[in-house]
């Protein structure tokens, strides 16, 4: 490895959990990685283990929809640890063991989904629904809030018992239910969960405190935080971010301080919500590192690690982000899908061999969210199919000339 990248392979701590380097595989839903009981299946274990083998210091699982009291999410495309806790623990413990063989920590992720992103779903207030401005979501009751919080804490405890190093809260970003609570434009409540900033953040801080109370201080709690919404109104995104009607960076800093005070151990920073999706899940035309300077403003004001998400899939950009002190590490989701060996190739001194994410959003977001089928990647045909598509070594290796660069030609070259 070139000494140039040394800092990216120094350890750091998330709470009391030491991470061996500055590369985090980001949480990203991958359909068909779970069985009908809401537990990881063998495909899911192979998928995450491949990223551990590829050198990531920690892998964050995709979001678990853990509510089975209010919305009762069925364990179909995403995990739900609470449907069959024993089976979940068995498979999750197997993943921890396999990733641990490579020195990689495993974090779960829990979320509530819903909010104004989904038609008819519960939201803090009856405001206009994303993509359907003439419709209004249902206002959640305090009792329903408490039941959902209870499920989140129970799921985190099960993850801790499975050997996970911590849990990430899919909470303060992307405009789902929990994120809606934080924004005055979507939260018009007059009870303890509305009004001033402390009240609006309360729904999250209560869960953070509850998780630490049940799981202990060694179990890390991280959170996704969108540091700027990039909207001028509900259902009106803003490419430039002028006339912000959602979350400003200044308010994100105050939220980050409250989260740190409540016991959050690290922030996974990004930008945008569904209304400005070109920021939340930026395509290839969005510049790499487009939000890095915004994250740096948050890091200056808190004492916990801030990790950069969103178009960070370039080795030199990763180096700049950490070396400059703008953030403490990088969170790679789509780049980890495109090349599970992203960190390893840098460590081996061959960063030019990294298969880059092209930001097409076809096999990842397109398959998993829009079409509800197995995830994939336009530049990595093995992505999410690691268990059954391992390269086979030729019985009699040969040097051959392959005419044509299509799928058949590429497979012939790999096999030879």
Where do the PLM segments sit?
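Flavin-dependent oxidoreductase catalytic cores
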Residues: 1-403, 407-415
């Amino acid at each position: 490895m070139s000494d140039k990248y040394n800092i990216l392979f120094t350890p750091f701590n998330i709470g009391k959990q030491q991470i061996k380097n500055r590369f985090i595989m980001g949480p990203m839903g991958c359909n068909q990685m779970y069985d009908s009981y809401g537990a990881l299946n063998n495909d899911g274990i192979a998928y995450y283990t491949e990223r551990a083998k590829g050198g990531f210091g920690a892998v964050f699982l995709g979001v678990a929809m853990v509510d089975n009291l209010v919305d009762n999410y069925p364990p179909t495309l995403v995990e739900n640890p609470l449907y069959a806790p024993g089976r979940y623990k068995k498979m999750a413990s197997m993943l921890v063991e396999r990733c641990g063989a490579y020195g990689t920590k495993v974090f779960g992720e829990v979320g509530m989904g819903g909010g104004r992103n989904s038609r008819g779903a519960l939201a803090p207030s009856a405001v206009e629904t994303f993509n359907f401005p003439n419709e209004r979501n249902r206002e959640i009751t305090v009792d329903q809030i408490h039941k959902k919080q209870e499920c989140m804490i129970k799921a985190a405890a099960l993850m801790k018992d499975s050997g996970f190093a911590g849990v990430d809260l899919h909470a303060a970003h992307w405009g789902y239910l929990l994120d809606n609570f934080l924004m005055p434009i979507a939260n018009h409540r007059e009870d303890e969960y509305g009004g001033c900033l402390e009240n609006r953040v309360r729904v999250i801080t209560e869960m953070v405190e509850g998780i630490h109370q049940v799981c202990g201080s060694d179990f890390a709690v991280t959170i996704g935080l969108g540091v700027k919404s990039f909207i001028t109104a509900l259902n009106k995104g803003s490419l430039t971010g002028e006339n912000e009607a959602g979350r400003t960076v200044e308010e994100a800093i105050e939220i980050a301080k409250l989260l740190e005070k409540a016991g959050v151990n690290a922030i996974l920073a990004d930008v945008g919500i569904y209304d400005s999706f070109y920021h939340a899940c930026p395509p290839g035309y969005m510049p790499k590192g487009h939000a890095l300077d915004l994250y740096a403003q948050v890091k200056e004001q808190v004492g916990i690690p801030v990790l950069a998400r969103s178009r960070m899939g370039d080795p030199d950009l990763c180096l700049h982000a950490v070396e400059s002190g703008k953030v403490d590490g990088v969170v790679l989701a789509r780049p980890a899908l495109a090349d599970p060996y992203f960190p390893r190739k840098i460590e081996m001194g061959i960063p030019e061999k990294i298969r880059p994410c092209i930001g097409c959003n076809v096999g990842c977001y397109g398959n998993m969210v829009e079409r509800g089928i197995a995830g994939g990647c336009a530049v990595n045909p093995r992505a999410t199919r690691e268990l059954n598509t391992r390269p086979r070594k030729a019985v009699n290796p040969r040097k051959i000339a392959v005419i044509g660069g299509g799928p058949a030609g590429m497979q012939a070259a790999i096999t030879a």
